[in-house]
Amino acid sequence: YGHSAFAKPDGARFMARQAAEASHIVATQHQLWTGGGAVLIQQAQAAIDAGAFHNDVVAVSNGNVLMFHAQSFDQKEAAVEALKRACGAKDFEPILLEASSDELNLDEAVRSYLFNSQIVSLPTGGMALILPREAEETPRAKAFVDRVLATNGPIREAHYLDLRLSMRDGGGPAGLRWRVVLTDSELAAINGRSILDGARVAALEQVVNRRYRDRLGMADLADPALLDESRTALDEISQVLGLGAVHDFQRV
């Protein structure tokens, strides 16, 4: 979290997007406090001011591995110790891969989207980093990745991909995925039509092509018809995904 919803740090360039209270209630609703299953760690204001509005721009994890920038957390030493205690309560030790400010400054970390990458577990064992091309083209970000690979730790491969279409739309690599680990029974309980497949992609594309305007100008934003068109599109998307009446206007 960034800070309390009821406080604004003095001299802050940007407001935090995650409030302590919101993060706390998420952990409560998911019953994560039992047995020390949750740790609330505050983002460093320096990272937020550098453009890391979401912490996945300066830290990324997979399994027991956390890769992070030295300036990602407020009171880093205390945050790391709290994390170690929580992991110890779950009978495992975290592997911490830290980029110091000397080897990679915050501007380089944010610009390269190094920590916005994905760490995946390989079927053959070990892990791989999937990164945007920007990380490869930023010399010190690339040097950090090379150092991680050379340590003979769990991350054994690095793959750089062209994700500039996503970057131009204002999102980094993390905007292309959201991973939720589920058991077989949990997966079976999900509305099957919410799982993306070829048929679902085609149906969603048809809604977009049929309902979305191909450009928006100031006059469009003042056009009452845009509201009706947007609601029609949302209603059709809800039908494609089998969501039912999830929006207020659908229940009128």
What function would you assign to each model-found segment?
Residues Y1-V252:
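The feature marks the mature, well-folded catalytic cores of soluble enzymes
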